[in-house]
Amino acid sequence: MDRTFVMIKPDGVQRGLIGQIVARLEDKGLKMVAARFERLAEATVNEHYREHIERSFYPSLKQYIMSGPCFLMVWEGKNAAAVVRTLTGATNPSEAAPGTIRGDYGLDIGRNVIHASDAPESAAREIALHFPGTGQVTYTRIDEPVLYE
């Protein structure tokens, strides 16, 4: 099974959307294997979003991510990164399809509720950054034999 990283951003936490987002991922058959609240430090934000540091929007993105607690999670399932990205929807909520997390809950591109790794490689990097060596569990959900052959 593959693992991917998901972060509910400060606007999602403040709006009480954690339960709805977790339910959508679980309803899809994914399994949460790690989770915690954290107010991210500047160094962690810089490493997480390192590909955006030189972009003009980065200072406001960093301020937003550091403005409140985030809910960090690792999810497991077949093609986990691709499945979660599909459920998440387009980065810009105005372009995200209804029924996706951003389509239903995102307000604008600057307050889009959720981050999800875009590929297995970035998932591995983000999991190592946010859950280094500890905090992940292995278990079998009762429905796994039905969901996965």
Curated annotation (Swiss-Prot):
It is found in: Cytoplasm. Transmembrane segments: none annotated. It is an enzyme of class 2 (transferase). ATP binds at K9, F57, R85, T91, R102, N112. The keyword Methyltransferase does not apply. This is Nucleoside diphosphate kinase. Major role in the synthesis of nucleoside triphosphates other than ATP. The ATP gamma phosphate is transferred to the NDP beta phosphate via a ping-pong mechanism, using a phosphorylated active-site intermediate. The gene is ndk. It catalyses: a 2'-deoxyribonucleoside 5'-diphosphate + ATP = a 2'-deoxyribonucleoside 5'-triphosphate + ADP; a ribonucleoside 5'-diphosphate + ATP = a ribonucleoside 5'-triphosphate + ADP.
